[in-house]
Amino acid sequence: MLQKIMAINAGSSSLKFQLFSMPDEQVITKGMIERIGKQDAFFSIQYGEQKHRETFAVENHQQAVDHLLSALLDHEIIKSLDEIAGVGHRVAHGGEAFSDSACIDAAALQQIEHLGTLAPLHNPVNAIGIRAFMEALPHAKAVAVFDTSFHQTMPPETFLYALPYRYYQEQGIRRYGFHGTSHKYVSQICAEKMETPLSDLRLISCHLGNGSSLCAIQHGRSVNTSMGFTPLAGVMMGTRCGDIDPSIMPYLAKQENKTADELNALINNESGLLGISGVSNDYRDVEQAAKEGNERAQLALKMFAERIRSFIGSYIAHMGGLDALIFTGGIGENSRTARAAICHALEYLGIALDETKNNANETFIQQDSGPVKIAVINTNEELMIARDVMRV
């Protein structure tokens, strides 16, 4: 029997949604509400061939949810709220408490809020969105889908930092990893397209966007990932520096009299492609500047690709080989030059890009003789959320 399942991604001032027919995985409607808390909040919704946009005042997430549900009725997308059988919520951090998506009850919601200490910008807002939908749709199944849970299969020798062990025991300091929903989804799709059981494959998923992370996936399980305790760690990103020598922070604090908050802003908001190029955090803008001869933009692109190649080599060693390299995310899916730069000089590892296939945006872009598949797969975190609502 078909069911209507809603996937929700609540941000500090936004609410993105998709309503699916499941299990046939058809999108019924999608849209978002932006500028929550403002007098000129913006609502957009798309269904069939119709698009509707409006501006109105929204004080909080509860009002945003109420407006969204009213719009579904007003536009006759549904006849009754009872038609919505379940709601899946993207939640940033599940810590060690959640190794999989979970049905939300009072105890689970309290745990999500408690984990706000690890994700203060995200978990509290995620919890607000959950409460708003649970109040508006008390009959509907509520499921939390965590960015971190896919990586809970990493072994301790991989997820622990070489700090005194008590900091892990008392403060939960360890590698958690993020983008798990995306990495999980594209690994499943890649296995389907390769017509090979996921349990037989060694994959590296490269989710590349303004935030970027890599994930080593062996037998369908995450065994390593580039992001760490926070989404700052790993490769160079739009405004985040990725891995650096930690001693740089106390050095800058002393030399430039910077506070902890100022240093945090520096490495999260002022670094990466933006910091090196001086042009933009948007890969497309940096790419254009590089074409026009901007040497710092050219350097930023080289650094971006080099950091990713280093992780690819490390993960191949970790898994003892590689069956497929996956590109996803805004950059991974859309920038043929980024894919080419990353794969450059990796032929000795079996990663041989076919330039014609890459430029044609085909799904598999490796040379015919290449032993490692190179796949370009559009991520769909909302669909993965809807699938998990049906599964758990």
Curated annotation (Swiss-Prot):
Signal peptide: none annotated. It comes from the Bacteria. It is an enzyme of class 2 (transferase). Transmembrane segments: none annotated. GO terms for molecular function: acetate kinase activity; ATP binding; propionate kinase activity. GO terms for cellular component: cytoplasm. Its main location: cytoplasm. It catalyses: propanoate + ATP = propanoyl phosphate + ADP. Disulfide bonds: none annotated. It is found in: Cytoplasm. Its EC number is 2.7.2.15. It holds the Pfam family Acetate_kinase. One of its GO terms (biological process) is propionate catabolic process. Gene3D superfamilies: 3.30.420.40. Keywords: ATP-binding, Cytoplasm, Kinase, Nucleotide-binding, Transferase. InterPro entries: Ac/propionate_kinase (IPR004372), Aliphatic_acid_kin_short-chain (IPR000890), Aliphatic_acid_kinase_CS (IPR023865), ATPase_NBD (IPR043129), Propionate_kinase_PduW (IPR024896). Pathway: Polyol metabolism; 1,2-propanediol degradation. CDD domains: ASKHA_NBD_AcK_PK. NCBIfam families: ackA, PRK12397.1. Belongs to the acetokinase family. PduW subfamily. Works with phosphate acetyltransferase (pta) to capture exogenous propionate and regenerate propionyl-CoA during degradation of 1,2-propanediol (1,2-PD). This is Propionate kinase. It comes from Tolumonas auensis (strain DSM 9187 / NBRC 110442 / TA 4). The lineage of its organism: Bacteria, Pseudomonadati, Pseudomonadota, Gammaproteobacteria, Aeromonadales. The gene is pduW.
